[in-house]
Amino acid sequence: MSLNFLDFEQPIAELEAKIDSLTAVSRQDEKLDINIDEEVHRLREKSVELTRKIFADLGAWQIAQLARHPQRPYTLDYVRLAFDEFDELAGDRAYADDKAIVGGIARLDGRPVMIIGHQKGRETKEKIRRNFGMPAPEGYRKALRLMQMAERFKMPIITFIDTPGAYPGVGAEERGQSEAIARNLREMSRLGVPVVCTVIGEGGSGGALAIGVGDKVNMLQYSTYSVISPEGCASILWKSADKAPLAAEAMGIIAPRLKELKLIDSIIPEPLGGAHRNPEAMAVSLKAQLLADLADLDVLSTEDLKNRRYQRLMSYGYA
């Protein structure tokens, strides 16, 4: 896979371009009287070291860019890599099937679970079909239908959060966007089965929270979670989206800050360079965390789950 490099990764991109050029030359003429393999190996080591150096000191705005990386694994990528026998379920049984939310039954290490997550899409046509990962009310109602089904059949619920926010279109508002989100918040707090939520990319406002009320809430290392995008915050406070880097630093949108505030439980480390560099390794780490979380929750009774979830929600906003 050819990687897309972000602005702050340009020094890495330049090294990788040199490696690609040397590799191409080596393939074209195997009779060259120079040791290209040795030089390629040296450059690869240099690239890894440079990547470590850059990623050891990332700011909030750089992490926000990584969370939106076009090659970052999405919900269906993790379903393919970490689960078995996925059977997608569609529709809210009231209006439509919103493709920005995907869900269905799968097996995690042989155990039946209900998976629900945002799905953005990669190519232009798919992005439009998925509405860039911004669900309409029918998406959240589909999610709620699947959660209630999971509760009926005593299946744990696993959600993957990756959205810039709920779709703010006129049609979505007319069909009850705010009501759909509010209802999900209420109903998720009452579910009698374990709920594990993981932010895998962008966690944008109520659009994220509508599938984010859980017994365990995790974030990938380079994901974000906030009430508004840095650009939106900058436009309000400074009347300019150009101040987004400043807003990102001030808002506390990154995983370490949110864990410090006790808004999340765990930070799942990403491969060097981000999840898109090695989706398979990322899926292994994610699966291990999900299994550990479910093991912790399995010992709790239904009432304990509900009470702990309620206390968690009520603790938000207190120092």
Swiss-Prot record:
EC numbers on record: 2.1.3.15
GO cellular component, one term: acetyl-CoA carboxylase complex
Reactions catalysed, as given in the entry: N(6)-carboxybiotinyl-L-lysyl-[protein] + acetyl-CoA = N(6)-biotinyl-L-lysyl-[protein] + malonyl-CoA
Subcellular location: Cytoplasm
GO molecular function: acetyl-CoA carboxylase activity; ATP binding; carboxyl- or carbamoyltransferase activity
Location of the CoA carboxyltransferase C-terminal domain: 35-296
Subunit structure: Acetyl-CoA carboxylase is a heterohexamer composed of biotin carboxyl carrier protein (AccB), biotin carboxylase (AccC) and two subunits each of ACCase subunit alpha (AccA) and ACCase subunit beta (AccD).
Protein's GO biological process: fatty acid biosynthetic process; malonyl-CoA biosynthetic process
Disulphide bond pairs: none
Alphabetical UniProt keywords: ATP-binding, Cytoplasm, Fatty acid biosynthesis, Fatty acid metabolism, Lipid biosynthesis, Lipid metabolism, Nucleotide-binding, Transferase
Record-given protein name: Acetyl-coenzyme A carboxylase carboxyl transferase subunit alpha
Organism classification: Bacteria, Pseudomonadati, Pseudomonadota, Gammaproteobacteria, Enterobacterales
Gene3D superfamilies in alphabetical order: 2-enoyl-CoA Hydratase, Chain A, domain 1
Gene: accA
Described purpose of this protein according to its UniProt entry: Component of the acetyl coenzyme A carboxylase (ACC) complex. First, biotin carboxylase catalyzes the carboxylation of biotin on its carrier protein (BCCP) and then the CO(2) group is transferred by the carboxyltransferase to acetyl-CoA to form malonyl-CoA.
Family: Belongs to the AccA family.
Enzymatic class: transferase
InterPro entries: Acetyl_CoA_COase_a_su, ClpP/crotonase-like_dom_sf, COA_CT_C
Recorded metabolic or biological pathway in which this protein acts: Lipid metabolism; malonyl-CoA biosynthesis; malonyl-CoA from acetyl-CoA: step 1/1
Chief location: cytoplasm
Phosphoprotein recorded as keyword: no
